[in-house]
Amino acid sequence: MPITKAEAQGVTRAFVRDYPGALELAYKFREDAAELYGPRAAEVPADMKGGYVPKETLHAGRAYRGRVDVPLQNVESASDLLMTLRHEVLGHYGANTFAPGEKRALLDGLAAARNEPTLKPLWDDVNRRYAGQSLDVRAEEVFALHCEGIEPSQHQVADQVQQRGQQSFTETCIARVRPMQADDLHNIVCMVAQGLRDRSRTQQNFPQFNELFRRDENMEPKKPFHEVVAEKLIEQLKAGTAPWQKPWEPGEPNAYLPMNPTTGKRYKGINAIHLMAQGRSDARWMTYKQAAAVGAQVRKGEKGTPVQYWKFSEEQDKLDDSGRPVLDAKGQPVKETVMLERPRVFFATVFNGEQIDGLPPLQPKKEQTWNAVERAEHILKASGATITHAAGDRAFYRPSTDSITLPERGQFPSSDRYYATALHELGHWTGHASRLDRDLAHPFGSEGYAKEELRAEIASMIVGDELGIGHDPGQHAAYVGSWIKALQDEPLEVFRAAADAEKIHDYVLAFEQKQVQEQDQQQSQAQDEAVAQALAVDIAEVLDNPDVSFSHYQAFQGDTLEDALRSRGLETVGSITGTDPEQFYAVAHDRLSPVFGIDPSHTDTDNAYLERKGLAQEFANMAEQLHLAQQLQQHGEQIVSSIDAEARWSDGQRIFAFHDQDGEPHQVRSLDELNNYAPDQLMALPALTQQQAAVADQEANMTPPTIDQAAALLAAHPADAVQGIEQAAAARRQLAAGEIDGQAFADATRQHLGVELPPDWSGELRIVGVAEQDGQTVDAAQAGIEPQAFQVYARKADAQFGEDAFAFVAGTRTEGQAEALAERLHLVDALGTDNQHERAAKLARVQEERVRRDPNATEEDISAAKEARKTAEASAMLNDSDAQRRAAELERQERDRQQAQPQAEKPERQYINVPYKEKDEAKSLGARWDRQQQSWYVPPGTDAAPFAKWAQGAATAAVEPRSAQPAPEAQGEAQKPAQQAQQARQYLAVPYEQRNAAKAAGALWDKAAKSWYVGPRADAAKLERWKPENVQAQQGPAMTPREEFAEAMRSAGLFTGSNAQGDHPIMDGKRHRVPVEGGKKGALDGFYVGHLDGHPAGRIINNKTGTDITWKSKGYALSDQEKAKLQAEAAEKLAQRAVEQDKAQEATAQRVGRQMADLVPIEQPTPYLQAKGIQAQAGVMTDREGQKTYIPAFDAEGKQWTMQYIQEDGTKRFAKDSKKEGCFHPVGGMDALAAAPALVISEGYATAAQVAEAVGHATVAAFDSGNLEAVAKALHAKFPDKPVIIAGDDDRHLVMTHGNNPGREKAEAAAQAVGGKAIFPIFAPAENTYPRDLPAITPDSFKTHLRAEQRLADAAAGKVELAGDEAAKLKASMLSGAQIAALSTMKQHTDFNDLAHKSELGIEGVKRQIGAAISQVQRDEQQHQEQKHVEKKQQQIEQRPRRAARIG
């Protein structure tokens, strides 16, 4: 009997309780397909149980992302409907929670595996039911069909589910390192299901109605990266066009190999080969985002090229002996770098410079001081290789004598050809056992010989480009056939060859690096000598300055200051300041301290402290002046004209002006200032080194990188916010110096920032999401509910035990607002720090956090920001002697503690049996991994109770203990010797990059344990450094083959562990039978055989379902830190999506433009204009009947992109597929807007027109609150000198019904974004305020009212029946008539149009309020400009160089 509608609704409610993400869909239950689809019912199968429509659906006033249709007559029971919901929601909707590129990869991975034994039964079923459908449709049906058997209990441990699902998705769909199996599909499905359960996944792919993300039917699934590369190179080898087959003439170094202009580094290894194989003439390659970051744009329709990278290390939290994270002084986890024993791969997509518009020209490389031939000759000599010249035309390397033979130099047509040949043979020479140790023992003409030639040839190409000596591959054409065969037999061979070629390149170029270092040292020494000579000025030059006085010294020390300095050998400026321009003041400070009888760390503000500081500053100033004069004399270039000056300024050169009154150089700081000088007063410094440029730009106790970084960080904030940050930072410095007290600091932060910071603020902030629960404000995360607001707290450094360590700072509505406030406060902390190194570290932390929050940031951007932060922190640490002393003391204490604990007293470890899939749970509880015993254990001092389920011998253990534990009898006698041997092994923690060294010392690889161990003939001393106790951080254990096999058995429906009536699987190479899911009681329908010999493998058969799996061990695992979402085609897909969107929007703009020809200007007000009480303005159109209103929308350049259509009843819509963001309508026209004294921007047209009537000039309609900020930014960029006013809507009624005021919030955000002012209408009393005598309305009470209203309406329509007194209870829960009326009144009074026509204040109220606001903004702008002018003049005065400061 079919299920009833009420029963179906009950099943669905239970389903969405299990999967709250399913609330994004509407559910439509009808008796049959005819009721669902009407005339189109014939288009669907008659026995269809359900259908998913990926189209936005409106129901009961709410928009849903899609709809599930269910014809009830085809659904037999609740369980039948449940499977239908899983199929449609978890399957089809779940597939659309992948981004388009990821879904494409998912379908490809499924299609590629359609003949795999574990998936073939599913595919056969789908092929039968969906014959004739595309491969994509059938692949998605396979995914959905598997979802029918998914239950919440199968994916309850979220972290493990996400890890396994992401690993399977990465390996089988993205990297495609192996075909998908049934267990992989199960892992991916569980990952999606869990995402819908915890609402971490939502729709990202938006196909058209009943249309999948399609591709051509004959398009084969994407091949693995190495196969794609190999096939391309095979084609080019046959055609003679492979990268290393192309000759090029000698010329500029680094002109041919692919490079990334953003990082300045070239691509290496197979990436370089693959990019060169694309046949581009431009050597520059970069990602889509890197191009956008420099203002360039990948052209529409261009396709990217994938490159791959390997990760050999990763950061992990450092743990103490109890397994808990080690925290630093600020409470943050300490990170440590772990070298991976099993490296991981990830991909990126790059575009060539020829595919990118607007890319800046490539900057020329730094010119070397020697030519290519000299460089090559030096490399040959520095290598020490034995090179002989003989008659004939043969060049070769002989391994037996370790020597190179070359023809006589005169036989070569040019010196470049000679050195190219010599360096090719030197490449072979590097393969000797004493160097890079490659396999060279192959006869001429053999396959092995050809492989070595491939390595040398690629290396020659790389070295030839590096040196600029050209490349001639003609002599090696004989190897082409062998190369093609090698790549056909093993596509990975070219990857190995390219990697070896890079090693050859590095080894060879290392000889040149010695020369570079020697030259750098000589240059540095010469520079130091030049600076020392410039600073060889007698100290009297400073001490005899009449503007300064150091009389206190003689009064207190009884000796003149000059005598005291000379007696200590300090007779010149350089002897006091040293010769390092970056350390002039610091060196002077330290060297002058003994003269004043105080320690360098002395900080008491007595006379000695003050005079030492003042004198050090005077000598540092003098040293800087002398150094600058020396640089100008050595490198300065006279500017010959104003055009020359502006050109040099644009090139970033430093320009100095010489005043007539003092003749001393003064650095020009702006283009306006530059124009104030005649050319003969100016001199440029184009040749400064980076270090010298940094010194020349040093000012105000800040290093140049700090200045630049601070300026860049501040630039993202409005001008008034920047001023507040700087003033609060100044107050923080004053507080630290004791110039103000804590209360004054708190007052200053309140005044300049709008929030109050505690005087003992440590610099740490905490953002907490909060919500209201049972009338109390609670931490949303702890309560397990969605946050309704966010609060910012500051840590108090001086909080005593028992006190609250955090002080409340402010509350915000959104997390973004809280993060923006936190960034401003962190900038206050950084800029308020005197120590330049600590300041730089704090600014680097702010920058890293900003990059991390940026949704457009790439992994490369995030990594670069992290490295910059780590570098800055290291610099701060190295320059903090106290911190170094504390660290050394802690290390000494820890070492003493360990030495004091005798070996015999170390507690015995408590080992536990942890299945691989539960390792993350055990690790989070504090368990540690013992590599020797191959088992997890509970660290001493850790509570063992949480680990009880894994205790050895526990009945709930899912798998057998690791090899350290005795094998169960069921494993059979044949396995015992192997297990005993494994148990006795001494395992090692060998990073992947050091595997060859360990292997050479006698280490062997254990395939089962995935770890190296000490071999029977190993050199134990050489392997000592890789013992686990000597390796600080190690990679986590890989899944054992037995655990992998158990996963495969479970995916095929076979029971394992205690459920299988024995401890299965038993990996002894024998046949075993076990029960299966759905099998009869006592039946053993499952068969398997598994072995651990060689490469672990096995076979699994489910005789009930017909599943037959041939299994092989994967051999490695990915950690949960990686969460690998490898996006080999992500940038390309984004570019394609942008191209399609641009095309659609351009087509719409043209269509709308043509439509304008059929419209007429408004002569009589349309129904909409009449309802709003506004007059017709030029530019607004109507139809020939004069009923509809058409409002064109333009961008800031005047191009029309779309149009707003307003029906007679006020219904509004925009042209389909049109561009609205940043578009607006200028009330009065674009010309009038350009002439307006201010930019007044409103939400809707009616408000903008009303305001235009009041102010008498053009205004702007942005159409809705969400578009205010984009319009304000576009117009502010167009008219930067016009003040901006946002005339916003004040939606007070929505605060009560929905908890927020979007009109006010969006208007304020838009004003803040452009430094403008937001204004809102002020109504007469009671017009826009809620009566105090009525009960308050909250979002919850309003929702309750709506639900009760709908329930009563359904009852009145006969749709539902109310039981007992339900109607009375529903009515009692509703809002009263007075409350509804008050809400209605408030809703009618929100904008300036309402103020003009619905308020008793009327149009005069609009004129008064708008006029006053504009006048005030204009006055403020005028004062701001005047203030800027005064500050500029003052800055010019302060920047005039002073020889000394007067000391009292």
Curated annotation (Swiss-Prot):
<dbReference type="GO" id="GO:0000428">
    <property type="term" value="C:DNA-directed RNA polymerase complex"/>
</dbReference>
<keyword id="KW-0548">Nucleotidyltransferase</keyword>
<dbReference type="InterPro" id="IPR006171">
    <property type="entry name" value="TOPRIM_dom"/>
</dbReference>
<dbReference type="Pfam" id="PF08401">
    <property type="entry name" value="ArdcN"/>
</dbReference>
<feature type="compositionally biased region" description="Basic and acidic residues">
    <location>
        <begin position="1418"/>
        <end position="1441"/>
    </location>
</feature>
<keyword id="KW-0614">Plasmid</keyword>
<keyword id="KW-0240">DNA-directed RNA polymerase</keyword>
<dbReference type="Pfam" id="PF18974">
    <property type="entry name" value="DUF5710"/>
</dbReference>
<dbReference type="GO" id="GO:0003697">
    <property type="term" value="F:single-stranded DNA binding"/>
</dbReference>
<dbReference type="GO" id="GO:0016779">
    <property type="term" value="F:nucleotidyltransferase activity"/>
</dbReference>
<feature type="compositionally biased region" description="Basic and acidic residues">
    <location>
        <begin position="863"/>
        <end position="872"/>
    </location>
</feature>
<feature type="region of interest" description="Disordered">
    <location>
        <begin position="1414"/>
        <end position="1448"/>
    </location>
</feature>
<dbReference type="GO" id="GO:0006260">
    <property type="term" value="P:DNA replication"/>
</dbReference>
<dbReference type="Pfam" id="PF18818">
    <property type="entry name" value="MPTase-PolyVal"/>
</dbReference>
<feature type="compositionally biased region" description="Basic and acidic residues">
    <location>
        <begin position="882"/>
        <end position="898"/>
    </location>
</feature>
<feature type="region of interest" description="Disordered">
    <location>
        <begin position="952"/>
        <end position="982"/>
    </location>
</feature>
<dbReference type="InterPro" id="IPR034154">
    <property type="entry name" value="TOPRIM_DnaG/twinkle"/>
</dbReference>
<feature type="compositionally biased region" description="Low complexity">
    <location>
        <begin position="964"/>
        <end position="982"/>
    </location>
</feature>
<comment type="function">
    <text>Required for autonomous replication in E.coli. Transferred into the recipient cell during bacterial conjugation. Catalyzes the synthesis of short oligoribonucleotide primers with CpA or pCpA at their 5'-termini on a single-stranded template DNA.</text>
</comment>
<keyword id="KW-0804">Transcription</keyword>
<dbReference type="InterPro" id="IPR043764">
    <property type="entry name" value="DUF5710"/>
</dbReference>
<dbReference type="Pfam" id="PF13362">
    <property type="entry name" value="Toprim_3"/>
</dbReference>
<dbReference type="InterPro" id="IPR041459">
    <property type="entry name" value="MPTase-PolyVal"/>
</dbReference>
<feature type="compositionally biased region" description="Basic and acidic residues">
    <location>
        <begin position="844"/>
        <end position="856"/>
    </location>
</feature>
<feature type="region of interest" description="Disordered">
    <location>
        <begin position="844"/>
        <end position="915"/>
    </location>
</feature>
<keyword id="KW-0235">DNA replication</keyword>
<dbReference type="InterPro" id="IPR013610">
    <property type="entry name" value="ArdC_N"/>
</dbReference>
<protein>
    <recommendedName>
        <fullName>DNA primase TraC</fullName>
        <ecNumber>2.7.7.-</ecNumber>
    </recommendedName>
</protein>
<feature type="domain" description="Toprim">
    <location>
        <begin position="1237"/>
        <end position="1325"/>
    </location>
</feature>
<keyword id="KW-0808">Transferase</keyword>
